[in-house]
Structure formats: structure tokens, C-alpha cells
Amino acid sequence: MLLLVGLGNPTPDSENNRHNIGFKIIDAINKKFGLSKQKPKFKGLLTTGNVGDQKVYAIKPLTFMNNSGICIRELIEYFKIDAENVIVFHDDLDVEFGKIKAKFGGSDAGHNGIASIDKFIGKEYSRVRIGIGKPKDKMEVSDFVLQNFDEDEMLGLEKITNNITDSISILIDKKLDLFSSTVNNKLWVLNVELLVCLMWVNLHSSTLSQTQAKPKLQIFLFVQ
């Protein structure tokens, strides 16, 4: 029996925040594997079902990020789930957007949700760190993680969640390194300014406002 946890904040305006990527992963798992309808239990939204041959519970804590551990401890004590059978999905500033890193144990690396879980159940559980990149310029980290993904990132995010759910059986078998490499090899993200865009701008410069910026195209190359 496994517990899958997605970290985030429960308010409607937080839905597309970078900090809420864990919630999106749980939603994708629920949909792909037809888990039960979400029910408010253990201070979270709980679903259950099977992923392959494995019985799983999946939860999105409603305690807000900094108190995530309260929800997790109540649930694992009730269902008698060992901490080593807990897998947590969360955002990570130190991982490039479009990449993931799965590991067992370790430090919280300044992530308040992970720090809360460590406090209530210890460090002996698996984490899937999902890259959101770093803030640009002088934006505060707290502002960056509570900011919505931009349009280009939302396009990539859908593919990331699909890649994770497609490879979830590897994760459930606790082959963390293989899971990371499998997911990461499916997605290349490339930022380019295409010559054709510049040519288009030059050809249509008479119809463009002088103050209008030249378009910059972000391409997501998906490798299956």
C-alpha cells in the first residue's frame, strides 16, 4: 500500500501557481488511473484505487503548504502506512523547468512543505522534485512560487504531467533513478529566437507599431 501526496495550497486563486504543481500531478494520476472521487478526509482531498497491481491512496492536503505534515501523519497513522511507502510530489526551485529529480530522504532544501512533513513523519520517504526554475531579476522567491505559470510554461506543464503519469509504474516500484531518467528523456525544452520570426517582422514592419516588441518563440520539443 502506497500513499501519493501532492503539495500545494487549497485556494482557488492558487490553482495555477508554481507552488501547486504537486496538486496537478495528483489530479493527473486520479484521472489516468480512474481513482475514486475526491473526498475531504484527514484534512485533505483523498482518493483511492489501484495503479497497476498496487493499492494506492492519493491526497492533496488542505492545510496549506506549511502545515502539510499534519495531514500526512493523520492519514498514515490511520491506514498504518509506513513512511517509506510515502511518495511526495512538490515544486523545486533548484531543478530546471521541465525536469524532475526523484530521491529518497534528504534535506528539505528550504521547502516549507517538505520541512513540515519531515517534522511529523521523519525524512524516510520518497520525493519527486519537479522543476519550476528560478526567479528572474530580483523577484523574491516567495513571490515567484506563488505566481502563476506563464502561457508557454502551461503548455510544457501538461506534457510533464503526462510523462510522469506514463512512467508512474517505475516510481511505484521505487526505481527512483530510472524514473527520473525516463521522465526527463521524454521532454526537451528549447528557447530559440527563430530567423523566420525576424523575417516576418521585417516584412510586416509597416503594419507593426514601432513600440511593439519582436516576437520571441518558445518551442517545446517532445521526444517520445
Where do the model's predicted regions map?
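Conserved G1/Walker A P-loop phosphate-binding module
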Residues: 188-224
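Hydrophobic alpha-helical segments within soluble ligand-binding/sensing domains
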Residues: 110-113
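Solvent-exposed beta-strand sheet faces enriched in polar/charged residues
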Residues: 89, 129-131, 218
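A hydrophobic, small-residue-rich beta->alpha segment in the mid-to-C-terminal subdomain
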Residues: 151-152
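Short, highly charged C-terminal tails/helix-capping segments
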Residues: 180-187
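Short glycine-enriched, charge-decorated loop/helix-capping segments at active-site entrances
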Residues: 101-107, 145-148
